[in-house]
Every structure is written in C-alpha cells, then in structure tokens.
Amino acid sequence: MHNQKKNQGFSVKSVVATGIGAAVFFVLMKFIAIPTGVPNTTINVAEGWLALIAGLFGPVVGLLVGLIGHTLNDAVTYGAPWWSWVIADGVFGLLLGFGKKYLALEYGELTTKKLVQFNVWQAVSNVLVWVIIAPLGDIIIYKEAAQKVFLQGAVTTVVNTISVAIIGSLLLVAYVKSRPKKSSLRSE
C-alpha cells in the first residue's frame, strides 16, 4: 500500500467562497462606502467582510476576494481598476487569511485572546498595505504626489482598522456562535 497525497488544489468550496465573497465584497464596497473627507478615501465595511472570508477560507481565497471585489468596484464606479489599491486589497486579504489556522473558526471557539491577537494582526496588515504598498504603488504606477497618497493611505489605515475591528470582529463572533462546538470525541 502506498500513501496517497491529499489533493492540494483549489476546492469547489473555495471556488464558491471566492465567487460569493467577491460579489458581496463588491456590493459592500460599491453601496456602503462612507466618505472620509479625504479624496477617494472611504470608510469601507467590505474590509470587515474580507476578514470573515479570509478567516474562514485562508490566504488564497482572501487574496482573490480582495482582488476581484475591488477590481469589480473600480471598473463599475470609475470605469477602470486603480491597480495599486486593487493589489493592496488583495494583499490585505492574503495577510488576513494567514490567520485561518490560528483562528480555527471551524471548531466553534473564538476566545477573547484570539480575537485581540487577530485585531493586532489586522492592524499591522492595514499599516503594511495602506501606508506602504498602496501609496508606493500610486507613486510608481500613476506618478501621484507622495503627500496626497500617503495621506490617503494613513486615513485608510485608520478607518479600515476600525472597520475590521468592529465589523470583522462581529462577523467572526457571529459565525462562531452559529457553529456547534466540535468535541474531541470521534465516532467509530
């Protein structure tokens, strides 16, 4: 007898999660965006949704939901994607998805400690993505003024961190409360 390798491909569940996740992300980003007063910068509830999807399905689904959802929003809203921010949202989903194994939401438990640590991670991820990746992308790709894009990045970092801390945390807690806790007992 030989050992069979577990299929490491993209599962049907992941494909469906990506499609539904990106569609909901697009709708939230398009229709529930609150202006901040800084041009092209909004309080975005879609980032809280991305936290749930990435926490449930991992980094690849998080990456794709961020990329696809943001691309759709920009294409519909502005006529073309703003690639530096599309890429940044994808990277944000990827980074959030790295928390999947740690959060272990499928086991129906989410401690306060895990939730606090997740929020520290999402805050660090927000800083990396919106203070570094997005502004540098704007400068390199679009030749935007540094002062403008770093202001946009700083504001986005703050509002997205708050959005994920509130909306993302509430979604994670609600999901876990809706799941039965898995015990360590196994039926034979």
Curated annotation (Swiss-Prot):
It comes from the Bacteria. One of its GO terms (cellular component) is plasma membrane. The chain crosses the membrane at residues 15-35, 48-68, 79-99, 121-141, 154-174. It is a multi-pass membrane protein. It is found in: Cell membrane. Pfam families: ECF-ribofla_trS. Its main location: membrane. Keywords: Cell membrane, Membrane, Transmembrane, Transmembrane helix. Belongs to the UPF0397 family. This is UPF0397 protein LCK_00164. It comes from Leuconostoc citreum (strain KM20).
